[in-house]
Design a protein with these regions (language model features):
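ABC ATPase nucleotide-binding domains
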Residues: 35, 76-82, 86-237
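The feature captures the beta-strand-to-loop junction immediately N-terminal to the Walker
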Residues: 39-41
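ABC ATPase nucleotide-binding domain helices that frame the ATP-binding cleft
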Residues: 47-50, 146
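Helix-to-loop junction immediately C-terminal to a conserved catalytic motif
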Residues: 54
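Conserved ABC transporter NBD signature motif
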Residues: 61-70
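Non-catalytic connector elements of ABC transporters
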Residues: 253-422
Length: 422
């Protein structure tokens, strides 16, 4: 059984444990050949969603389709799904070869095909020299690679990954991501990958769905989520360090413009945003500034004016490969902590000193303080259209703007609709 041309469709999916809905009215359309990532904090419902797709948990309400076929009542073994878990789930009494071959043997695959596929998978995951060993003779990273090889050696309708790289060190994790992407493109079937690591989600996902408390927050490419988050939660969750948030008021300026006023600064609203911000004059809003959009005035690669800076007291300096991350606090009676990711090193002598940082005003975000929904974003890095990265049924990536299914488009374009209403 395979998803055919329709991919995987999830309609109004609900999973309850007692009175609590851990997955609440979830709607998704996973395209054929797409590597789709579910990301969110612990307890958001992402692993439960994966288990519902696999048939390991009964559906409380809603529908799951593989292609045109409703699979709600189909047994896990009959869904033709391959799973990789964080806890390896390999058989301790079998050799590495036997573990990898287990699923193929259970489906009575020819011996020559089993040998060929096991050899190819072992080569891809660099475990050829381990085929005769038992799991107790392997390291944690080697066991995880065996689990990946066992799941990916067979032809499945859907591949499911539940934080499979969490137990690997940084170098192995990076290599394993490349291996998963390589094999995914070869297979050409849809895959759903669960992680709490937003960096991993950005690296792997053709599209990413952000979940919180069982509810879908937003679906889009990594760039779309980063530059056009639909609410404050997505804005803070996607990005490291998280976005800075300041409570500001919109005030008219003497020259007929508008300013975002905070006890520590009075930032001018760029001319291209004036019409969209004007309806909020006199109201409180939450201003979002990404850490990399704060730079020393003389080193900024964007337009800087005297009144487009925020002064802060340097509390911590963390050197990075390309610059440094600086933790500061505003100079008001009640200091507000914020963070800047600088492209240049800041000497340790700046600790405890006051420094000005220029704000890239064309990259600001504004949110409603009541519900956290986005009201305004600056333009995308490339153009004003939401960017999607889709894949063809063969698994080859096809870059460029692409249309979303209606249920997802309504979620990820909520902020755009609010901007137009303004």
């Amino acid at each position: 059984m395979g998803p055919a041309s329709g991919g995987i469709v999830i309609e109004h999916l609900v999973k309850r444990f007692g009175e609590r809905a851990v997955v609440d009215d979830l709607n998704l359309h996973i395209q054929p050949g797409e590597l789709f990532v579910l990301v969110g904090p612990s307890g958001c419902g992402k692993t439960t969603t994966l288990r519902l797709l696999a048939g390991l948990e009964p559906v409380s309400d809603g529908r799951i389709y593989f292609g045109e076929r409703l699979v709600n009542d189909i047994r896990p073994r009959d869904r033709n799904v391959a799973l990789v878990f964080q806890d390896y789930a390999i058989f301790p009494h079998l050799t590495v070869f036997e573990n990898i071959a287990y699923g193929l043997r259970a489906r009575h695959a020819p011996r020559n095909l089993i040998r060929e596929r096991v050899a190819n998978a072992a080569r891809l995951f660099r475990i050829e020299h381990l085929l005769g060993r038992k799991p107790r003779q392997l390291s944690g990273g080697e066991r995880q690679r065996v689990a990946l090889a066992r799941a990916l050696v067979r032809d499945a309708a859907l591949y499911l990954y539940d934080e499979p790289l969490a137990n690997l060190d940084a170098q192995l994790r990076h290599q394993a991501r490349e291996d998963i992407l390589t094999l995914h493109r070869q297979k050409g079937q849809p895959a759903v990958y669960v992680t709490h690591d937003q960096a991993e989600a950005m690296a792997l996902g053709d599209r990413i769905a952000v979940m919180r408390d069982g509810k879908l927050q937003q679906v889009g490419s990594g760039l779309d989520l980063y530059e056009r988050p639909c609410n404050q939660f997505v804005a803070f969750f996607i990005g490291s360090p998280g976005i800075n948030l300041f409570e500001v008021e919109v005030h008219p300026d003497q020259d007929g413009g508008l300013r975002l006023v905070h006890p520590a600064f009075r930032l001018p609203v760029p001319e291209e945003f004036q019409a969209r911000v004007a309806p909020y004059t006199g109201r409180r809003l939450n201003l979002g500034i990404r850490p990399e959009h704060l730079q020393p005035p003389k080193r900024a690669d964007f337009a800087v004016s005297e009144d487009s800076t925020i002064r802060g007291l340097v509390n911590v300096i963390e050197p990075t490969v390309s610059g440094c991350t600086v933790y500061l606090s505003t100079l008001e009676p009640t200091p507000r902590d914020f963070v800047a990711t600088l492209k240049a090193r800041l000497p340790g002598s700046y600790l405890g000193r006051e420094v000005p940082l220029a704000v890239n005003l064309r990259k600001i975000h504004l949110f409603d303080p009541e519900d956290g929904q986005a009201l305004l974003h600056g333009p995308l890095a490339t153009d004003d259209r939401p960017i999607r990265v889709t894949v063809s049924p063969s698994g080859e990536p096809a870059n460029g703007p692409a249309e979303q299914p209606t249920s997802e488009r309504e979620t990820s374009e909520a902020s755009t609709q609010r901007e137009e209403q303004a």
